[in-house]
């Protein structure tokens, strides 16, 4: 399969999905959402895929929503989203995380760099989250005056506890990878050059 916003590589029964918009720090847009959903649909049907690793190309995992289109950022056309305007649902990250939650095989997120907004919240639907020492995480929705997206108000308290989830979302602060490990947002921390090999192992 070919995708515009990601790479899809299967080797030794492991599918590696690489978010591939490095010029924008892999910022999330509707093309990426559609590509990710199609990738998980394809992997669910492929008996050769036993597990999935999701990572980012370049120095970032995902910089959050791509806001470069201004007011049209969340106003997709039929051609780019595949639905009529009347059928449009606003939380693109939520549609993605619910698809991942229904996925039949293990999903490992290997966070290689900064992950903010939907870049952080999409990882909550994974089964395992590991990160490089270069990773940072931010549930920054309060900074924009919006509620947390991608079902993170359900996932995050189950992972880090209600008090820490509230503190992270109320403050909107960015946390370093060592703090993410301390609060069990990730399960292990790795040298950047070892991240993918460790994820595979």
Label each PLM-derived region with a short phrase.
Residues 17, 54, 66, 122-124, ...:
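Hydrophobic/aromatic residues within transmembrane alpha-helices
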Residues 31, 35, 92, 99, ...:
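Charged catalytic carboxylate motif
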Residues 56-99, 115, 145:
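Glycine- (often His-adjacent) and acidic-residue-rich active-site loop
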Residues 98-201:
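Crotonase-fold acyl-CoA enzyme core
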Residues 1-57, 73:
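Conserved CoA-thioester-binding segment of acyl-CoA-metabolizing enzymes
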Residues 20, 65, 112:
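Histidine-centered beta-alpha loop that forms part of the nucleotide-sugar donor binding/catalytic region
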């Amino acid at each position: 399969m070919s995708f515009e916003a990601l790479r899809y590589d299967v080797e030794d029964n492991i599918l590696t999905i690489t978010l591939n918009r490095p010029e924008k720090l892999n910022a999330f847009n509707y093309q990426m959402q559609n590509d990710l959903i199609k990738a998980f649909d394809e992997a669910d049907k492929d008996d050769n895929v036993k597990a999935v690793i999701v990572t980012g190309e370049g120095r970032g995992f995902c910089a959050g929503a791509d806001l470069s289109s201004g007011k049209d950022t969340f106003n997709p056309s039929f051609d780019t989203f595949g639905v009529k305007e009347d059928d449009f649902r606003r939380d693109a990250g939520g549609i993605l995380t619910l698809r991942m939650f229904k996925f039949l095989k293990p999903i490992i997120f290997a966070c290689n760099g900064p992950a903010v907004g939907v870049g952080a919240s999409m990882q909550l639907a994974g089964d395992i989250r590991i990160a490089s020492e270069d990773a940072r995480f931010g549930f920054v929705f309060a900074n924009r005056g919006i509620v947390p997206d991608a079902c993170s108000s359900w996932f995050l308290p189950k992972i880090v506890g209600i008090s820490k989830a509230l503190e992270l979302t109320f403050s909107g602060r960015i946390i370093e990878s060592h703090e993410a490990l301390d609060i069990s947002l990730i399960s292990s921390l790795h040298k950047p050059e070892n991240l993918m090999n460790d994820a595979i192992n």
